[in-house]
Amino acid sequence: MSELTTVARPYAKAAFDFALEQGALDKWAEMLSFAAAVAQDETIASFLSSSSTVGKTTEVFLGVCGDELDDNAKNFVKVLAENERLPVLPAVSELYQTLRAEHDKEVTVDVKSAVKLLKAQQTALIKALEKRLQRKIKLNCSVDKSIIGGLVIEAGDTVIDGTLRGKLDRLAYALQS
């Protein structure tokens, strides 16, 4: 995946910069997401890998996308096709979303708990995390039955282990040292 990321990064950055300049961040996010879904389709993916002519590849790909892409996005796809980079569109879309979240000062936080969190708990958690991380928070909550109690919060490289098991482990470590 790192090679795909390396190849996709300049394209994602170019698309993001253009969308920012045009004031069309949402529109480009939708178009890239759609084009990425098309590129991931098994039939299209096999066609992209077997097609030898750039013109035919571009024509078919844009034909499948139809009116979902505006002229600028179509030109973007043509550049990708000319450089034989259409298969990296999903990575371009993902990196674009990352750049957009960074620009919007937004972070997706994964929260694992033993039971489903109530709306009030989610709201309180969002407020506390926004204060601590100084960013807009988007929660992605999941239930993990192996957690006896408490929460595991993952935000990028930051992990906050507030589970009972984590607290017991820290207590045991403190007693041993």
Curated annotation (Swiss-Prot):
Any one GO CC term of the record: plasma membrane
Gene Ontology MF annotations: proton-transporting ATP synthase activity, rotational mechanism
UniProt keyword list: ATP synthesis, Cell inner membrane, Cell membrane, CF(1), Hydrogen ion transport, Ion transport, Membrane, Transport
Segments crossing the lipid bilayer: none
Key word Cell inner membrane present: yes
Compartment annotation: Cell inner membrane
Record bears the keyword Cell inner membrane: yes
Primary localization class, coarse: membrane
PROSITE patterns according to UniProt: ATPASE_DELTA
Topology of this chain in the membrane: Peripheral membrane protein
Protein origin, superkingdom: Bacteria
Cited function: F(1)F(0) ATP synthase produces ATP from ADP in the presence of a proton or sodium gradient. F-type ATPases consist of two structural domains, F(1) containing the extramembraneous catalytic core and F(0) containing the membrane proton channel, linked together by a central stalk and a peripheral stalk. During catalysis, ATP synthesis in the catalytic domain of F(1) is coupled via a rotary mechanism of the central stalk subunits to proton translocation. This protein is part of the stalk that links CF(0) to CF(1). It either transmits conformational changes from CF(0) to CF(1) or is implicated in proton conduction.
Assembly description: F-type ATPases have 2 components, F(1) - the catalytic core - and F(0) - the membrane proton channel. F(1) has five subunits: alpha(3), beta(3), gamma(1), delta(1), epsilon(1). F(0) has three main subunits: a(1), b(2) and c(10-14). The alpha and beta chains form an alternating ring which encloses part of the gamma chain. F(1) is attached to F(0) by a central stalk formed by the gamma and epsilon chains, while a peripheral stalk is formed by the delta and b chains.
Family membership noted in the UniProt record: Belongs to the ATPase delta chain family.
PANTHER family: ATP SYNTHASE DELTA CHAIN
Record protein name field: ATP synthase subunit delta
Gene: atpH
